[in-house]
């Protein structure tokens, strides 16, 4: 059975902001330098009730290739000493740090429920538990923001890393989820991590994690199947 919620179109009320009344927290799957420096992100937080932001290499690629907003880094003397990964991280970490700072009031006002910004470990590590652990810890330390979320794929190799990172106290955004069984596995990993922290006498009230289902990927697949049926 499918249910739906209709947001009342009350005069003067932004429908997106109205989602907050239903316990929903809108996040934006996008990041770009001018949103951070030009006041656009702050406006979306204040006017639209935006509560979080995610990023990934593909998003940064579009932002970098489609603008001159990152010329200061790309044309710097330091850029000549960095490889492609180094340049990407230089750009991504600065933007994510600034986004975290902009979302910090939301993070504080919601008592750590909202106000997170996600940064992804390298996709090349999706099947590498040890590599994922090392990179996630390095990014967490380098960004240095308590409202950062590290994106880790919910692959078989990613699950042990997710559990350990949560036990270590990192905030984790679990991605690449396409099935209920996969969600059950990451939920069990989350609970196991909390239990391990509790047994060590560590605080679990600040442990934060989200499970990200790739609904758009499913929509795209279903649309293609429907097109075949129509033909």
Regions found by a protein language model. Give the residues of each.
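N- or domain-start disorder-to-order transition segments that initiate the globular core
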Residues: 2-39
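Hydrophobic faces of well-ordered beta-strands that scaffold small-molecule active sites
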Residues: 24-30, 51-55, 115-121, 148-152, ...
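Active-site beta-loop-alpha junctions enriched in small/polar residues
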Residues: 31-33, 58, 122-126, 153-157, ...
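Active-site-adjacent beta->alpha loops and helix N-cap segments on the catalytic face
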Residues: 35, 128-134, 152-166, 179-191
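Glycine-enriched alpha-helix->loop->beta-strand junction motifs that scaffold or abut catalytic
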Residues: 49-50, 144, 161-172
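Active-site beta->alpha loop and helix N-cap motifs at the rims of alpha/beta catalytic domains
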Residues: 55, 59-160
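Catalytic alpha/beta core domains of metabolic enzymes, predominantly
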Residues: 170-231
């Amino acid at each position: 059975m499918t249910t739906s919620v209709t947001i009342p179109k009350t005069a003067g009320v932004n429908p997106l902001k109205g989602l907050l009344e239903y316990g929903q927290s809108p996040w934006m799957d996008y990041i770009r330098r001018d949103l951070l420096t030009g006041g656009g992100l702050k406006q979306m937080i204040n006017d639209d009730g935006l509560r979080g932001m995610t990023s990934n290499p593909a998003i940064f690629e579009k932002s970098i290739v489609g603008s001159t907003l990152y010329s200061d880094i790309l044309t710097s003397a330091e850029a000549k000493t960095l490889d492609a990964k180094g340049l990407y991280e230089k750009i991504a970490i600065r933007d994510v740090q600034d986004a975290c700072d902009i979302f910090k009031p939301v993070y504080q006002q919601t008592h750590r429920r909202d106000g997170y910004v996600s940064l992804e470990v390298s996709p090349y590590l999706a099947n590498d538990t040890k590599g994922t652990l090392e990179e996630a810890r390095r990014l967490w330390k380098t960004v240095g923001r308590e409202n950062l979320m590290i994106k880790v794929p919910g692959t078989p190799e990613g699950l042990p890393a997710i559990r350990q990172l949560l036990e270590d106290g990192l905030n984790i955004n679990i991605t690449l989820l396409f099935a209920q069984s996969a969600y059950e596995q990451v939920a069990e990993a989350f609970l196991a991590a909390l239990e391990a922290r509790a047994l060590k006498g560590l605080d679990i009230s600040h442990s934060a994690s989200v499970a990200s289902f790739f609904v758009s990927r499913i929509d795209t697949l279903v649309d293609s199947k429907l097109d075949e049926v129509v033909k």
